[in-house]
Amino acid sequence: MSDCILDIPGGDASKFFINRQIDIQNAFIKQLNRCKDLSVEILRLESSFNGWYYYAHGKEFLKDARRPYYIWVIGNKNHLSRLNKNVPLSEIQHGVKNYFAYSTPSEIPFEIANKAGIKKGNTCICNLDSDGKYRFLIKANMSVTLQDEQTICNMGNYGKLNSFVNIERIDRISAKESFYTHLLTVAIDRESVNSVGEKLSLVSLEKPDWLENANDNLGREVIKNMDKTTGIKYIIQGVADAYKSNKELAEIKFVISRPLKSTHLRDIARKQCPADFFNK
């Protein structure tokens, strides 16, 4: 837990910030080489502050001010996932203003069923809908990605291999006893469908969309920048640089099989073993 303020010394502040960014990047790269599942959760919160606020060349008295502070949770992504399940962000006292997480790629647990929820082993048979599309459901456990609901449920954050495969919606599974956390509705266009392997992937985001507005580069005139943190952009960017080679956070692999007979009636989707995914 920290206010994460970088105290700017005399001289070139931009050079100072960049050097701290590089220091943080190198520190995380070193630890990632030791622990391949090392992940980071960054929580931005606010608290009341009364007293003198000191910076390099001055001070200001703050009374009943609201100032940001940060909680960093660093560790194995599986441990962090269990922590999030036991202590959801929504239950943190006084609330979390902003959140972002960096993690390494995972093959997440999932199962496939048709629209009625019917499956046979790892396979489901999908009947053609009236709009010319086949639809099936994917129940996935996305908790190990450590991403918030907004990120997971944004369909624009997902990649795919085939243009005729589309995620139509993503819903949170509310049942607390469920092993799976999210339900993906997937549609396949009848006119374009082929028997192919498919991979849906949750793409890594480089940095939080709130970061620029949370950052201050000057370290003075605190009253005018009450909701900003000096240098936070460079601290978080250092972490982002350490994780930039991880383009995907999660992947869901399956095979779409179109039988030679009765292709107008049904298509088949099934989970795929990683070993032969690209050979189908």
Question: Which residues make up each language-model segment?
Answer:
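Acidic, low-complexity intrinsically disordered regions
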Residues: 1-280
